[in-house]
């Protein structure tokens, strides 16, 4: 697993599991709202009144509507982190 996935995947997965509403800012400035339904290496499925497939390379920022705990990876020896809005 690449280094950036050590934060990205647990963060997105926690948002998905807890159904936290998010604002997703794209690199062109467009702001999307919704709940992360699923994601993979290349895309995030963002659900609102419809489900949108958003390519990760087009995403600038993901802002959760509330604080989210990111579970620490057991093998990394790092502390559990939090991300605040």
UniProtKB/Swiss-Prot annotation:
GO molecular function, one term: RNA binding
Ranges in coiled-coil conformation: none
Keyword RNA-binding listed: yes
SUPFAM superfamilies: Sm-like ribonucleoproteins
Entry annotated with the keyword RNA-binding: yes
Pfam (any one): Hfq
Domain Sm per the UniProt entry, residue ranges: 9-68
InterPro entries with a match to the protein in the record: Hfq, LSM_dom_sf, Sm
GO BP terms in the entry: regulation of DNA-templated transcription; regulation of RNA stability; regulation of translation, ncRNA-mediated
GO cellular component, one term: cytosol
Keywords assigned: RNA-binding, Stress response
Subunit composition and interactions: Homohexamer.
Function: RNA chaperone that binds small regulatory RNA (sRNAs) and mRNAs to facilitate mRNA translational regulation in response to envelope stress, environmental stress and changes in metabolite concentrations. Also binds with high specificity to tRNAs.
Family: Belongs to the Hfq family.
Name this polypeptide is given: RNA-binding protein Hfq
Organism: Legionella pneumophila subsp. pneumophila (strain Philadelphia 1 / ATCC 33152 / DSM 7513)
Protein's gene: hfq
């Amino acid at each position: 697993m690449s280094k950036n996935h050590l934060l990205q995947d647990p963060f997105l997965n926690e948002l998905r599991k807890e159904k936290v509403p998010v604002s997703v800012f794209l690199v062109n400035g467009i702001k999307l709202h919704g709940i992360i339904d699923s994601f993979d290496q290349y895309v995030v499925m963002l659900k609102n009144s419809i489900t949108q497939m958003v390519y990760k390379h087009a995403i600038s920022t993901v802002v959760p509507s509330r604080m989210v705990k990111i579970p620490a990876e057991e093998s990394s020896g790092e502390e559990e982190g939090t991300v605040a809005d």
